[in-house]
Amino acid sequence: SDATTEGNKKMVRKHPFAYCVCTAGDSIGLTIENLNDTIALNASLQALGITEVSASYSLIMPESYVGLPFMDVDPKEREVRKKSKSAQELSVICEEIFDRKEGVNRLVKGPIPWFFTKVVGGFFEKVLITDKRFHVEKDKCVKCGICANVCPVGDIKGGHGEYPEWLHHKDCLTCFTCYHHCPHHAIEFGRQTQKKGQYFYK
């Protein structure tokens, strides 16, 4: 009946559906496990009936981490290939999320997910996630302020006639957004980024 249908719709709306779509250059390790652990400690989410994600996905996108000697952006051909494949996968993901499809876990965790999350990830958190190595090549910088504008945590001030300055508030994610968006390649991360490429999604 119409009344039953309407009642079912209300029940569906009340049932929480949490999902996660994460991106990576090659693999995500134990990202979803860590997320679920965080959700389990969040009283506000627990009160809403959310104890873990109902569906999880990973999209392999072009490499953007350039903070180590052996890491650089992908060649153009690989970049295009990854973006094309991810666009197709994203269409399917959107449909499944719209339909609130539960129990889906299409993830690229990598060959040794615990090692890259716990050991390598731990090293990154302690040593490599910092703004202290960022600096500007003043002979290239035009003081446009793009780096300050795109920083997701507001860790950079500058532009409008001033050189960029990292604020060392310990908020830096070392996401390299400032590096990749600089139109004159004037931002470096120690010596690790010299002669390396830039990438951001267009």
Predicted segments, located by residue:
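Rossmann-like NAD(P)-binding element
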Residues: S1, F176
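FMN-binding flavodoxin-like domain, especially the glycine-rich phosphate-binding loop
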Residues: D2-F123
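A short, structure-level motif marking secondary-structure boundaries and short turns
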Residues: Y19-V21, G122, D131-R133, Y163-P164
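Short loop or secondary-structure boundary microenvironments that flank
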Residues: C22-G25, K140, D171-C172
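A mid-sequence, solvent-exposed acidic-amphipathic segment
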Residues: P111-G145, N149
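Iron-sulfur cluster-binding cysteine motifs and their immediate structural context
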Residues: V136, V142, I146-L167, D171, ...
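Active-site-proximal loop/hinge segments that shape catalytic or ion-binding/gating pockets
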Residues: Y199-K202
